[in-house]
Amino acid sequence: MAEKFIKHTGLVVPLDAANVDTDAIIPKQFLQKVTRTGFGAHLFNDWRFLDEKGQQPNPDFVLNFPQYQGASILLARENFGCGSSREHAPWALTDYGFKVVIAPSFADIFYGNSFNNQLLPVKLSDAEVDELFALVKANPGIHFDVDLEAQEVKAGEKTYRFTIDAFRRHCMMNGLDSIGLTLQHDDAIAAYEAKQPAFMN
C-alpha cells in the first residue's frame, strides 16, 4: 500500500513558468532506472544546475533559494507536466519531497500519473493561482494547508476550493495504488481462480 494522503501542511515554492514539460522535470538521460527512487537528485536538473553532472547549483533557480529548502508544495502555472508521457516525472517530484502541485491546468497523462504516485495535483483558476503567487512572493517561507478530505487549500487568510473525482480521492486517502486496489479483491480473485478447470491453471 502507498502512503495515505488526507491532509498536508507544507512550505510552498513558486515556479513561475507555464508549459513546464516532463523533459524539464526529469531530463531523458536520467530515465534508465525503473524503480521510483533516486530521481529527486535530478529534478529540474537543467535548471537547478549549471553543469551537466549536477555539481554546481544555479543560484538563480528558485528551488535553490535558501528560503525554499524543504518545500513540499509546488506552485506552478498552466499546462504543467506537458510533453512526453514519462511516469518518471511524478517519481522525481515525490522523491525530491513534493506532496502537492498547484496549477491552473495539467497535461492529462501527467495528471493521471500523479494520482498513481500519491502526488496531489490541485487545479485552481488562473486568478486564484495569480493570488497565490503574489502571496508566496510577498511572504517567502509561507506554508499552505491542503485538505484532500475537505478539498480545500488554506493559504494565509483565504481558503480555496478544488475538486478531485471521487474514485481518485478515495484511492489517495486510503493509500491505494493499482496493486492495492487489486489486493482489495484478493479473496474474490482466488475464489474465481479456484472455480476454473484444471487445464486453465
From Swiss-Prot:
Pathway: Amino-acid biosynthesis; L-leucine biosynthesis; L-leucine from 3-methyl-2-oxobutanoate: step 2/4. It catalyses: (2R,3S)-3-isopropylmalate = (2S)-2-isopropylmalate. GO terms for cellular component: 3-isopropylmalate dehydratase complex; cytosol. It comes from the Bacteria. One of its GO terms (biological process) is L-leucine biosynthetic process. Signal peptide: none annotated. Keywords: Amino-acid biosynthesis, Branched-chain amino acid biosynthesis, Leucine biosynthesis, Lyase. HAMAP family: LeuD_type1. Catalyzes the isomerization between 2-isopropylmalate and 3-isopropylmalate, via the formation of 2-isopropylmaleate. Heterodimer of LeuC and LeuD. NCBIfam families: leuD, PRK01641.1. Belongs to the LeuD family. LeuD type 1 subfamily. This is 3-isopropylmalate dehydratase small subunit.
